[in-house]
Amino acid sequence: MDFHTFGGQPYWCEAACYAFTPAEIDVIEAATDELHALCLEAVERLINGGDLERLAIPETFWHWIAESWRRHDPGLFGRFDLAYDGSAPPKMLEYNADTPTALLEAAVIQWHWLEEVRPGRDQFNLIHERLIDEWKAVKARINPAWRVYFTGVLDEPEDLGTVEYMRDVCEQAGLAGQSLDIAEIGWDGKDFTDLAGRPIRVLFKLYPWEWLLSEDFAPHLLVGRTAFIEAPWKMLLSNKAILPILWEMFPGHPNLLPASFRRSDFSGPCVQKSVHGREGDGVCLLAAGDAGSAAQCIWQALCPLPVFDDQYAIIGSWVVGNKAAGIGIREDPQPITGNSSVFVPHYLS
């Protein structure tokens, strides 16, 4: 699978692995469930308050997003990025609630590694089974004759791998699936369509909501009949502006870091994050006195990642449905996790 290599370096890494005690996994699982619950409370407050401007979302889409939430459109999956050293409470760095990647590695590949390299051991990994269950729940909500479409920028190998894996999981749940590139989706005046002109009634998209809202066809989202996975309301949680909003709502929570819309709220070192940044893009470590940027950014207290053998380690804690489902670890020699950071497996000691 060629997306496991970036710049000639393997993305999947077996040079190391992480051993967790059952108690440590219990801590991560509980923190993940707690954080997801806090995030849902934040969505409810934002929807009821109608104040989505703080998330740099155009007002045109506010009602549409709110209706998605009030219909209980399903949120299939997401990934919290957590800083955890085994002693202090896990800290939420962000929530990749819209287009999380490293899914195939976390759900399947590290499980095969466990069976081959650590037979007899266990792993916190129910991701695959939970995804099948969630797709079965989707199946119960829709017309059984509908086909589920899967889209993204499919000439990107990692996106293609993730989309094809998710399509396979969907088909294991008993639904018909079909993949097509985002550029191949058309519009017939009332529906988004596939290349054959068939209406797309259900669409799994590995394509960020903020990108979709900026496309020329964005107004069609408001009138089309397509059900999207992830649902429109999930864009509130993948937005870094949710971090200061969570801190305002739950100040001092042990799993949250102080965060603000104002750089001046931090006198010492902090982290600047672009509201719509992904895979480490738009993340900058600021020293005391550094002014930073004023353009659609938030600021978060610095929480250094634990370092093992000169590698910074971050935990990706997966949510499937509304429950913690498993973890994956990524390492990087730099303190900011990015697209080329390697994936490292784990097991329970």
What kind of region is each of these model predictions?
Residues 1-349:
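Preference for protein termini
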